[in-house]
């Protein structure tokens, strides 16, 4: 008798995706982040659902409802901080996942990569609208500053901003629609993630060497299920440590002050995972130029498959490209640090240099290194 998991229409899909999936035998722990992102997404949807049961998306009660969740709801404080720090874990996994893709040339699976970029944008949008919901000072001013960037669009800018606000400033209408977006987007992300997996399973996984491994594959279960469980346990352990010992480590103290349109915080800054893009935005003294640089800092990922000049897919055997890759990581860390600093000397010039280097590395230096490495190998 044939096993039910191979015949039942639903079980067959799960079987082909998580059990009998042929997988390269040499993929490292850098390939764990995909499953960890799935875990983060499930966790965020569940904690978010329980928070939504007690939260009220109204300017007069939003801040109080969050305080009520933390004080009066059973384990409400735990759910709230799991959700807030879960977002940070989500972005750590996301950036590691993208970094892995860049290093090992996974972007050569173009459909998978492009849907991945869409996923990144959707997660960033979700995190942004979610940060507005507690209606603290940083929520309000963050929403005001970022939505205001759209006014830089010629001709339709101002109308567009007022349309998004639902009025002439960030107010009740804005909060209500942001709550609606924050609720619906994770389900759109789930659907996109399923399509992301669908395209990945059309080609099979890449591996550290970048060489096709079709002739040497192993089943996903038990080898990689056990490996993913280990990764999941480490993720949960880290998240619990963060949530139970230092829940406010990554947050902003200003968000414990209720939103006040009449008082601007000394330093308006987003959550840590947006600081690199915020630094690029601030490094250009022109509003429209800054907005375009901000957009391009993320959308540049779409062009990466077109910028592949090397005849080798992975960076595993390419020392020049490796050096530039780690320079890019250091540059992104520098931008993240600059994004959290006030706009004054020497931070301004450091931010401008780091922004120039970011685009220079991706668009010029890395493709050039690929060509040089081809020459050195006489290819």
Curated annotation (Swiss-Prot):
PROSITE patterns recorded: CYTB_CTER, CYTB_NTER
InterPro entries, A to Z: Cyt_b/b6_C (IPR005798), Cyt_b/b6_C_sf (IPR036150), Cyt_b/b6_N (IPR005797), Cytb/b6-like_sf (IPR027387), Cytochrome_b (IPR030689), Cytochrome_b_C_euk/bac (IPR048260), Cytochrome_b_N_euk/bac (IPR048259), Di-haem_cyt_TM (IPR016174)
- Entry GO terms, CC: mitochondrial inner membrane; respiratory chain complex III
Give TM segment ranges: 33-53, 77-98, 113-133, 178-198, 226-246, 288-308, 320-340, 347-367
Which positions in this protein are listed as binding heme b b562? Answer: 83, 182
Topology in the lipid bilayer: Multi-pass membrane protein
Q: Which Gene3D superfamilies match?
A: Cytochrome Bc1 Complex, Chain C
Q: Where in the cell is it found?
A: Mitochondrion inner membrane
- Sequence positions that bind heme b b566: 97, 196
Q: Which GO MF terms are attached to this record?
A: metal ion binding; ubiquinol-cytochrome-c reductase activity
| Cofactor(s) needed | heme b
Instruction: Give the result of residue 25 to S, as annotated.
Output: In strain: Isolate South Africa
Extra notes? Heme 1 (or BL or b562) is low-potential and absorbs at about 562 nm, and heme 2 (or BH or b566) is high-potential and absorbs at about 566 nm.
Name of the protein this chain belongs to: Cytochrome b
């Amino acid at each position: 008798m044939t096993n039910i998991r191979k015949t039942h229409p639903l079980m067959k899909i799960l079987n082909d995706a998580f059990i009998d999936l042929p997988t390269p035998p040499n993929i490292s722990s850098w390939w764990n982040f995909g499953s960890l992102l799935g875990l983060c997404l499930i966790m965020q949807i569940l904690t978010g659902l329980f928070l939504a049961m007690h939260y009220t998306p109204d300017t007069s009660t939003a801040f109080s409802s969050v305080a009520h969740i933390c004080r009066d709801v059973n384990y409400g404080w735990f759910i709230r901080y799991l959700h807030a720090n879960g977002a940070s874990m989500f972005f750590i996994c996301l950036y590691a996942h993208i970094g892995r893709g860049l290093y090992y040339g996974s972007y050569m699976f173009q459909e998978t990569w492009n849907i991945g970029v869409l996923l990144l944008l959707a997660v960033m949008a979700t995190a942004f609208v979610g940060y507005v919901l507690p209606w603290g000072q940083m929520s309000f001013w963050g929403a005001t500053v970022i939505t205001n960037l759209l006014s830089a669009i010629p001709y339709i800018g101002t109308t567009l901003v007022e349309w998004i606000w639902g009025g002439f400033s960030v107010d009740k209408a804005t909060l209500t629609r942001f709550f609606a977006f924050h609720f619906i987007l994770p389900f759109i992300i789930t659907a996109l993630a399923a399509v992301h997996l669908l395209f990945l399973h059309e080609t099979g996984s890449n591996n550290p060497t970048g060489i096709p491994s079709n002739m040497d594959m192993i089943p996903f279960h038990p080898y990689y299920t056990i490996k993913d469980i280990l990764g999941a346990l480490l993720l949960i352990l880290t998240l619990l440590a963060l949530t139970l010992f230092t829940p406010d480590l990554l947050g902003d103290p200003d968000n414990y002050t209720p939103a006040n349109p009449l008082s601007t915080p000394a330093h308006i800054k987003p959550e840590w995972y947006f600081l690199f893009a915020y630094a690029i935005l601030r490094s250009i003294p022109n509003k429209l130029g800054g907005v375009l640089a901000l957009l391009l800092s993320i959308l540049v990922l779409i062009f990466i498959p077109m910028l592949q000049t090397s005849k080798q897919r992975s960076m595993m055997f390419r020392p020049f490209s490796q050096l530039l890759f780690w320079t890019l990581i250091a540059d992104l860390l520098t931008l993240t640090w600059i994004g959290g600093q006030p706009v004054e000397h020497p931070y301004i010039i450091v931010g401008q240099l780091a922004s120039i280097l970011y685009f220079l590395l991706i668009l010029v230096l890395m493709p050039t290194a690929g060509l040089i490495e081809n020459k050195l190998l006489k290819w």
